[in-house]
């Protein structure tokens, strides 16, 4: 996974030394690694692949700037994910809902996780960024290079598809 990269240990956790060379980089890495790993994991569906993506995100971001912002890190993540998945235009199109599908009540976490993984890549990333990480639509739009209305539409389409997938799994 990290072939040829020397490891440095800080408080028991492993950090690639190619990524973390100073205290400020360590602070940036520590502040953002969990958020970025979660997004990478949900987009790849694989722990090892998510770790590789995470490493590449930080290497790329630290090559661009000594102190990359959260948005720069997000853009680096999207660039890495684009190499793995077809991110781009919204892929779902739903007609107006004539009725609300019956998914009220408790939904098992494993059912929701499976449904999220079945969403198309762009809608999944918008859903994870907005509902999972609390990003605003303007930030999502800037990060993905889409318009704010497209971000809103992608979130709505993703939620409708989740509702459909959850209703069908019952």
Language model segments and positions:
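A short pre-motif secondary-structure segment
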Residues: 126-127
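DNA-recognition helix of helix-turn-helix
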Residues: 144-170
């Amino acid at each position: 996974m990290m072939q040829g990269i020397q490891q440095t240990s800080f408080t028991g956790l492993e950090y690639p030394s190619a990524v973390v060379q100073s205290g400020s980089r360590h602070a940036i890495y520590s502040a953002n690694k969990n958020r970025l790993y979660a997004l990478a994991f949900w987009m790849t569906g694989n722990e090892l692949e998510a770790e590789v993506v995470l490493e590449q995100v930080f290497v790329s971001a630290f090559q661009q700037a000594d102190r990359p912002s959260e948005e720069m890190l997000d853009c680096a993540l999207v660039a890495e994910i684009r190499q793995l998945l077809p991110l781009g235009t919204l892929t779902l199109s739903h007609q107006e809902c004539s009725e609300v599908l019956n998914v009220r009540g408790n939904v098992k976490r494993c059912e929701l996780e499976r449904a999220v993984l079945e969403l198309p890549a762009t809608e999944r990333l918008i859903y994870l960024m907005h509902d999972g990480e609390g990003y605003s639509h303007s930030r999502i739009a800037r990060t993905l290079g889409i318009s704010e209305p497209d971000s809103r539409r992608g979130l709505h389409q993703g939620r409708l598809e989740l509702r459909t997938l959850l209703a069908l799994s019952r």
